[in-house]
Structure formats: structure tokens, C-alpha cells
Amino acid sequence: MMGTEAVVADLMSIDPVVVRPDTTIEEAERLLQEFDITGMPVVDDEGRPVGVISQTDLLTTMRPAIGVLIRAKASGLRVGELMSTPAITVPIATPLVEAARQMLDARVHRLVVIDDRGRAVGVLSATDFVTLYADG
């Protein structure tokens, strides 16, 4: 297991799959399935996170009936209309202990890791922490 001095860069997933606010919900669903992920950062044209779209966001919106899902796809619903905002971010050099506390305090399953220019460079998920602990 990593020591208490380990930082976000030691555990995060690099080169995250990202979408833009104008991405269709259908495309976001396809990316989630294709890359076997449960959520991804939503970024602006400069790569700065503006939100997060997750399976939870999609399911909460689509739960009432299958007809809602069909209408949403037909209507061209966009990620920007469903994403969770703001994106909860963490600088790449943040100690893992601080990142874990931030995740708990914000009650989120993932943090968007940012560089010194505020651009998304990775994702740190609750699953990453579970894997770290399980691998001991």
C-alpha cells in the first residue's frame, strides 16, 4: 500500500475520457459503455472541467419510463442539461489523504484531477481507493 505521502498523481487514471456540454446524451452513454466507466468529466473548449456526467445522472433522468428515454434521445438532449455541476476538482499534487477527505465531504464518487492551468488530466475515483486498499 502507498504511504501517507502518496499524492493524487500516484493513483489517478490518466488521459480521462471527456465530453463537452453540447455532446448528446446518446453519445455520452455510448462512451460510458465503450470505456466501461461510470462517469466522466465535462470540459470546456480549453479542457477545463465544468461538470461531470455519470450513470447516476442518466438513470435519475431516465427512470420514470422507457418512453422518457426514447423521447430524450429523439429530442437531442445534451450533456450540459443533465451534468452535475460544478465538477469537484483536485490538483494533481494533492496528498491522497486530502483527496479522500474531499471526496467524502463532497459526497462524490470521483474527483477530476487538474493541472496547474486548470485542465482535466485525470480522474480519481472511489474505486481507485478500494483497489489500493484491496491490493494492500
Ranges and model annotations:
Residues 1-15, 54-89, 95-108, 120, ...:
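Tandem CBS (Bateman) regulatory domains
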Residues 32-35, 40-56, 103, 111-127:
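A glycine-centered beta-loop-beta connector
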